[in-house]
From Swiss-Prot:
Primary location: membrane
UniProt KW RNA-binding keyword: no
KW Ligase (keyword) present: no
Keywords: Membrane, Transmembrane, Transmembrane helix
Cell location: Membrane
Organism of provenance: Arabidopsis thaliana (Mouse-ear cress)
InterPro entries listed in its UniProt record: NEAP1-4
Protein's name in the database: Putative nuclear envelope-associated protein 4
Membrane topology: Single-pass membrane protein
GO CC annotations, alphabetized: membrane
Motif Bipartite nuclear localization signal boundaries: 8-29
Ranges that cross the membrane: 82-99
Length: 105
């Protein structure tokens, strides 16, 4: 009977040792996974910052292009409005009046 209990004890000790080994291996794997997760988060933050910087740069370029377009449109409208200005109309009217007056003489 004593041999039976000795065998059972040895068997249980072997199982405990196997469980310890498995536990240590799992702990190592968990540590590796935690490290990988940490590195992934760091890389994700870096990529987010790069994306934000790129978005800001694109926004600045778009704002500059919009401002240039508005300035160009304003320049065009000021040139087109030359015909609508009252001073220009007066000068043209006076010039035509003078031309008509000289052409009748």
């Amino acid at each position: 009977m004593s041999a039976h209990w000795t065998f059972k004890t040895k068997e249980l000790e072997d199982q405990v040792e196997n469980q310890r080994r498995i536990d240590q291996e799992l702990k190592k794997k968990v540590l590796k996974l935690e490290f990988c997760l940490r590195e992934t988060r760091i890389q994700t933050r870096k990529l987010q910052k790069m994306g934000e910087r790129n978005d800001m740069a694109i926004q600045e370029v778009l704002n500059e292009q919009l401002a240039a377009k508005k300035q160009h449109e304003a320049d065009l409208s000021s040139n087109q409005n030359l015909w609508d200005k009252s001073g220009f109309k007066i000068i043209v009217s006076m010039s035509m009046l003078i031309l008509v007056a000289f052409s009748r003489r």
